[in-house]
């Protein structure tokens, strides 16, 4: 990014190659729309060029990039007002990759739990959903999340804890609802 900041804007292609997949997954998990995710990834790289002078080499590039992504996502949501954002497709894909080949009964139970988890994630407020996406699905460190969200690390820890608790409660409520 230092070269881009110094005026060698062609170097953005290297950054794109390194980071576009992670940004794409982030946006798909937030908006569940692959075409929109592609558009937002492009927007992030255009913003990186536009605001390249604001990058501080002493800080984390990844945190700066996700701060731009966070802002692009917020701008989109503000324009759309009322758009529901969820991450069940991403959750299902991640679980499939993480698991070994289960038997048919285990696969059915897992699929059912993933569907409930997706519904629970849909019901979470956007701020809680986003902090879970960043911490659990993008596997960002608390320090990086704090930079993205412009808050203290301790605040991030509390928000992650509260988001996980809220997700657990919603999931358990949906399980009870399904059982009755």
Spell out what each predicted region is.
Residues 2-25, 49:
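A short, charge-rich alpha-helical start-of-domain segment used by transcription regulators
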Residues 5-6, 32, 43-60, 79-81:
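Sigma70-family region 2
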Residues 16-17, 24, 34-51:
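Conserved RNAP core-binding helix
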Residues 27, 78-81, 124, 129, ...:
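Short, Lys/Arg-enriched C-terminal cap helix and immediately downstream tail that follows
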Residues 39-46, 59-71:
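Structural recognition of an alpha-helix C-terminal capping motif at a helix-to-coil junction
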Residues 50-57, 67-88, 102, 110:
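Arg/Lys-rich amphipathic alpha helix in sigma70-family domain 2
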Residues 70, 74, 116, 120, ...:
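DNA-recognition helix of helix-turn-helix
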Residues 92-119:
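Acidic, proline/glycine-rich intrinsically disordered inter-domain spacer in sigma factors
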């Amino acid at each position: 990014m230092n070269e881009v900041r110094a005026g060698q804007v062609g170097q953005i292609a290297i950054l794109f190659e390194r980071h576009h997949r992670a940004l794409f997954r982030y946006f798909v998990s937030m908006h569940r729309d692959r075409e929109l995710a592609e558009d937002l990834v492009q927007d992030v790289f255009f913003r990186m060029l536009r605001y390249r002078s604001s990058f501080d080499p002493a800080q984390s590039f990844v945190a700066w990039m996700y701060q731009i992504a966070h802002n692009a996502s917020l701008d989109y949501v503000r324009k759309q007002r009322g758009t529901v954002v969820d991450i069940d497709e991403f959750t299902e894909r991640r679980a499939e990759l993480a698991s070994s080949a289960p038997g048919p009964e285990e696969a059915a139970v897992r699929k059912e739990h993933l569907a409930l988890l997706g519904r629970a994630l849909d019901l979470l407020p956007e701020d809680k959903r986003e902090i879970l996406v960043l911490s659990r699905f993008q596997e960002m460190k608390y320090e990086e999340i704090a930079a993205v969200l412009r808050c203290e690390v301790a605040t991030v820890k509390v928000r992650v804890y509260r988001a996980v608790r809220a997700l657990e409660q919603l999931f358990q409520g949906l399980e009870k609802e399904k059982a009755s």
